[in-house]
């Protein structure tokens, strides 16, 4: 009778476990999020994950490729170049619809902020994922989406944002306020981004596609002609100001060399690197030590 009772109890536990689901570990591989919008219905959007060996849960590091990019190829290259970083984070590489991210007038009209938020929410449920201190990094068009996520998201999972060769554009900040994209991509609603974050921007002094000094791009279209940008140093100051800096904009770098000028606010919690000899290839000047140093920063404000 005792054996039968134990057997029934075991069966009951199995049934309960099956009904509520057993917490699982995230593993390396490809995953999808299903979304519908004007261009697609029930469309499976891909992202790729690299999970390092770790005895403790690790935070997420999400990378967004530039226009025309490929997430799987980005993962191979980025993890090879940044091996120490790839041991400290669960690395995620999301694929943009039509190799694009929906900013102003790009090919993609997809709900991309919601896509990134869905990835974070989904992966945070795994036992080997730390739900806090997530990092969102993007290059060019991907960096523009990083800015938009930083502007609009209400998810508090992110602690660090990294934007490479795309400071704020003039639709995202009109000189007075940060702007939500809106369903029609008209950027008319003023919003207040979450505070207490860290932000790193890297821009090329000779960039013509995303002009360092601001103004219209020579190649990126917008609804009213060419996409205009905020001055890169001004853009960094606007973020620093929002995140708690109360002083005047820096007019001189805090560190300088022939290769790179550094503008540091809030003890490095908000930092801008001006690559003096580079253009839209400024991301090539970003080293793993630079990333690791920034990711060790915190913003208590």
Language model features with spans:
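The feature captures the conserved acid-bearing segment of alpha/beta-hydrolase catalytic domains
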Residues: 159-160, 166-248, 264-265
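A domain-start/cap signature at the N-terminus of enzymes
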Residues: 21-60, 89, 108, 132-162, ...
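Bacterial N-terminal signal peptides that target proteins for export
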Residues: 1-9
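C-terminal catalytic-base region of ester-bond hydrolases, centering on the histidine
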Residues: 215-301
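Alpha/beta-hydrolase active-site loop
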Residues: 106-127
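Acidic beta-to-alpha connecting loop that harbors the catalytic carboxylate
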Residues: 67, 97, 205-208, 213-216, ...
């Amino acid at each position: 009778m005792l054996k039968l009772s134990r057997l029934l109890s075991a069966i009951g536990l199995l049934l309960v476990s099956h009904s509520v689901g057993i917490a699982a570990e995230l593993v390396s591989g490809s995953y999808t999020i299903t979304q519908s919008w004007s261009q697609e219905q029930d469309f499976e959007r891909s992202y790729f994950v690299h999970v390092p060996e770790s005895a403790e849960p690790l935070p997420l590091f999400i990378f967004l490729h530039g226009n025309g990019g490929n997430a799987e190829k980005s993962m191979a290259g980025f993890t090879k170049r940044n091996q120490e970083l790839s041991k400290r984070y669960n690395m995620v590489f999301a694929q943009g619809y039509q190799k694009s991210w929906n900013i102003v007038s790009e090919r993609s009209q997809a709900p991309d902020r919601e896509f990134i938020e869905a990835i974070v929410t989904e992966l945070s449920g795994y036992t080997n994922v730390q739900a806090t201190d997530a990092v969102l990094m993007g290059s060019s068009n991907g960096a523009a989406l990083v800015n938009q996520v930083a502007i609009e998201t209400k998810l508090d999972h992110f602690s660090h944002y990294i934007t490479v060769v795309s400071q704020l554009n003039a639709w995202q900040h009109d000189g007075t306020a940060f702007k939500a994209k809106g369903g029609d991509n008209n950027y008319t609603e003023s919003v207040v981004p979450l505070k207490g974050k860290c932000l790193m921007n890297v821009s090329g002094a000779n960039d013509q596609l995303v002009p360092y000094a601001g103004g219209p791009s020579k190649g990126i279209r917008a609804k009213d002609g060419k996409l205009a940008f905020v001055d890169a140093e001004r853009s960094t100051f606007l973020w620093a100001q929002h995140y708690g800096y109360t002083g005047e904009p820096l007019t001189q770098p805090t560190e300088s060399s022939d290769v790179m000028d550094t503008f540091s606010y809030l003890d490095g919690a908000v930092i801008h690197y001006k690559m003096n000899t580079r253009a839209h290839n400024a991301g090539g000047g970003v080293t793993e030590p630079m990333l690791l140093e920034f990711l060790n920063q915190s913003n208590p404000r």
